[in-house]
Amino acid sequence: MGKQPLAKKAEIVDKVRSLLQASQMVLVIDYKGLTVAEMDQLRAELRKSDSVCMVVKNTLMRRAIADQKAWAGIIPFLAGPTAFILIRGDISAALKAYQDFAKQTKKTEFRGAGIEGLSLTLEQAKAIAELPPKEVLMAQVAGSLKSVATGLAVGLNAVPTQVARGIHEIPASLGRAIRAIADKEAA
C-alpha cells in the first residue's frame, strides 16, 4: 500500500475528529481475518444503533485524539490491525450488535473501549451499556429529591401540631391534678 499524501491524511484526521466529537463511546477491535463482506455486515448492524465502524491507521487515530482528553483511554489499544466502533446513539444496542457479530464470525477480538478519558474492559463497557438513559437517571434523581422534600415538609408540619397538642394538654393535665388533690382532701 502506497503512502498517502499529507493532505489526504489531514482530511482523514479531521473526519475522525468530527466523528469522535459526536460519539459517546469508542470500542477498539481487532479486525484481522474479517472479509470485506463481513465488515459491511458489521457496519450495517451498527448503523441501526447510530454507530459507525471504521478502519483507520493507528497513527492517524493518535493524531485525531492527541488534543482530546476524552479519548485518551483508547491509546493503549492502538496496536496491530485496528477497527474503531464510534457509538453515537444507544450504547447497549451497539455493544449487543458487536457481540452478536463477534459470536457469529469468531474472527474479531475486543481490545477495549474508551469513554471520558477512561480505558474500559468488555465487562466495564457492558456495565455502562446496562445503565438507564440519562433522562431516566435524571427523573429518578428528581423523584428521590421530591420524596425527601415531601418527607421534610410533612415532618416540619408535624412539629407545630405536636406543640399545639402539648400546649392544649397542659391545662387539661393541670385540671385533672387539681381535681385529684381536691378529691383526696375531701376524702
Swiss-Prot record:
SUPFAM superfamilies tied to this protein: Ribosomal protein L10-like (SSF160369)
Subunit structure, as described in the record: Part of the ribosomal stalk of the 50S ribosomal subunit. The N-terminus interacts with L11 and the large rRNA to form the base of the stalk. The C-terminus forms an elongated spine to which L12 dimers bind in a sequential fashion forming a multimeric L10(L12)X complex.
Gene Ontology cellular-component annotations: large ribosomal subunit
Function field: Forms part of the ribosomal stalk, playing a central role in the interaction of the ribosome with GTP-bound translation factors.
Sample GO molecular function, one term: structural constituent of ribosome
PROSITE patterns: RIBOSOMAL_L10
Keywords, alphabetical: Ribonucleoprotein, Ribosomal protein, RNA-binding, rRNA-binding
Gene3D superfamilies the UniProt entry points to: 3.30.70.1730, 6.10.250.290
Similarity comment: Belongs to the universal ribosomal protein uL10 family.
Gene Ontology terms describing biological process: translation
Pfam family, one: Ribosomal_L10
Name of this protein: Large ribosomal subunit protein uL10
